[in-house]
Amino acid sequence: MSGFLTSLDPRRVQWGAAWYAMHSRILRTKPVESMLEGTGATTAHGTKLAQVLTTMDLISLGVGSCVGTGMYVVSGLVAKEMAGPGVIVSFIIAAVASILSGVCYAEFGVRVPKTTGSAYTYSYVTVGEFVAFFIGWNLILEYLIGTAAGASALSSMFDSLANHTISRWMVDSVGTLNGLGKGEQSYPDLLALVIAIIVTIIVALGVKNSVGFNNVLNVLNLAVWVFIMIAGFFFINGKYWAEGQFLPYGWSGVLQGAATCFYAFIGFDIIATTGEEAKNPNTSIPYAITASLVICLTAYVSVSMILTLMVPYDTIDTESPLMEMFVARGFYAAKFVVAIGSVAGLTVSLLGSLFPMPRVIYAMAGDGLLFRFLAHVSSYTETPVVACIVSGFLAALLSLLVSLRDLIEMMSIGTLLAYTLVSVCVLLLRYQPESDIDGFVKFLSEEHTKKKEGILADCEKEVCSPVSEGEEFSGPATNTCGAKNLPSLGDNEMLIGKSDKSTYNVNHPNYGTVDMTTGIEADESENIYLIKLKKLIGPRYYTMRIQLGLPGKMDRPTAATGHTVTICVLLLFILMFVFCSFIIFGSDYISEQSWWAILLVVLMVLLISALVFVILQQPENPKKLPYMAPCLPFVPAFAMLVNIYLMLKLSTITWIRFAVWCFVGMLIYFGYGIWNSTLEISAREEALHQSTYQRYDVDDPFSVEEGFSYATEGESQENWGGPAEDKGFYYQQMSDTQPNTRTSSKAKSKSKHKQNSEALIANDELDYSPE
């Protein structure tokens, strides 16, 4: 053994210790308690964000941030260059991917409701710091490009209204700048720069001001959409959907178009970033996400149908498709009506992209992963004004230089990756064991936590109190607290949920305790999917569950099952990436029905199915939330698959630009963020504190134990809880350069230590406080 120890290379040991330290840093998670403690509290700079947003405000933000650019720009771009009339199918595929990701977002929104930062915050709580930074950094890219794209689209629309007079004047007066992404005859788009700056000022003025402005523009946009539907109906021509015309680019073009159309749905994550400013995030966030996605899908499909039935797909104008389609049919007055809607829709879309960007930067800077001056909140506007100005300036600069199509494609890849990681987080979190803190109460907002704790506390007094001495036990306790407390709570349905009524039943003889007799049925009594399945297959339902090895109600996740799910999810992500890559880049071999290609596809499908089935066999965490993603693990797994596929359908140059952005982010994280994060500073302070102070028991004055409290400033030592005999310990400050040389001696009896301590007290030689 001694030979083995002496053979160890000290440098190898040092590298191992360094790797372990780095590994622990990148995987550390932010405690949820720190999020909830900050609920409604002031920020580090002394100002809190205003909680003024209603559910309708959130829906308006989500719809507005999507519909503008999606309806007035993306529909024409995808229809002409990628999918033809099949753009309708592209929008539906993109909507399915968005809805799958949206339900995962909604669950995260109610887990940590009072937050800014969206998927960044959720990942920091559940997965780890490095993944959280990576997601947050790409969300910044998403909003940065979205803002620039909105400004560029508005500039193109104004130029189209002016018969391209603005662009010609720019080229003649300012000149062209080749190689900056706007084509061979590119010019600095000063109008887009001015538009981005104006919207930045609007957002920096305050949440309520910007949301009110957003709502007005949405109403105007809705009116124009109704006009397009009614007026366009009189000009439709079915021959443009004739045989061979609906999918001119084939299914490959439809799927490529779906990847770009995904850009038109990404606005729903703005809802998740406003949790700290929403009045009731637990119910508002999931409802607003679902409603905004459905509204957007309806708008896109209807507009795409009118567009592709009014003009041939190859003649669609990519800059202002909805205005020019009426011009092509001779209805010139409609151009100006649609122009009003275009201004309203694109402006609110621009606002929707710029609104969440400073809040993600604010959240990351507050955690120390970005420069902390970016977390400054104005006491006048109650907004992160520094982050607003910096992000708005960068977006304005980008709109000045880069083309609209390049912006849209680059934006989609970062968003798809963020949504994929959100789905991964849902899978991981739902199958992990319970923490020391009650997960139900832990993840609810403060107001719901108080109500939940109040219910259980009242019931504990009357149901769970022990039998007094001399009192006869008269059988099971009967609840008297539930009848007077539960009906008075308006949010009781949401807090406890219908599935918990059998467990916390006011008429149940053991109210307030877990019902151990109902088995699987109690857990699934309100699960509509399982009810339909049981009706379909009848009594064989429970036999099938046992044969498939599915967990029962009383099964609880353990560290081992949680680790199994983590490994399965990691393998699932890698296998899906390989599978989608082969489907896309090896499509020729598959279409030729090469035996090895078919065999490889079947093998990967079987492996993916097996991993999902292994996850299905693991017990879920029993904690209930106001909203939970349905059909686990199938919904998050399918969302991962669709998002990865759409990512790989984007162009190579988009991946190269994305890689450059990620490289810059890694430089910032490993050069600044990892060493200045709030968790790192707290860990250093704790380590310094532990190395400076030692605790010594009076019974064993030379033993070292952890955990003691300081005297508050101005508090006398006599008020520390009584004499030393009652306290049982004293503190001594240790010097880092003079380590403690006294060691504990078990040979000495406790009575000897007691005598020594009493002698010290008598001579006033015992010091109770750090020097």
Curated annotation (Swiss-Prot):
Span list, region Disordered: 712-771
Principal cellular location given in the protein's record: membrane
Biased amino acid composition, Basic residues: 745-754
Membrane-spanning residues: 58-78, 83-103, 130-150, 187-207, 216-236, 251-271, 291-311, 336-356, 360-380, 384-404, 407-427, 565-585, 596-616, 628-648, 655-675
Compositional bias of kind Polar residues: 732-743
Entry-annotated residues carrying Phosphoserine: 465, 468, 488, 757, 769
Topology of this chain in the membrane: Multi-pass membrane protein
Family, as annotated: Belongs to the amino acid-polyamine-organocation (APC) superfamily. Cationic amino acid transporter (CAT) (TC 2.A.3.3) family.
Full protein name: Solute carrier family 7 member 14
Taxonomic source organism: Bos taurus
Gene it is expressed from: SLC7A14
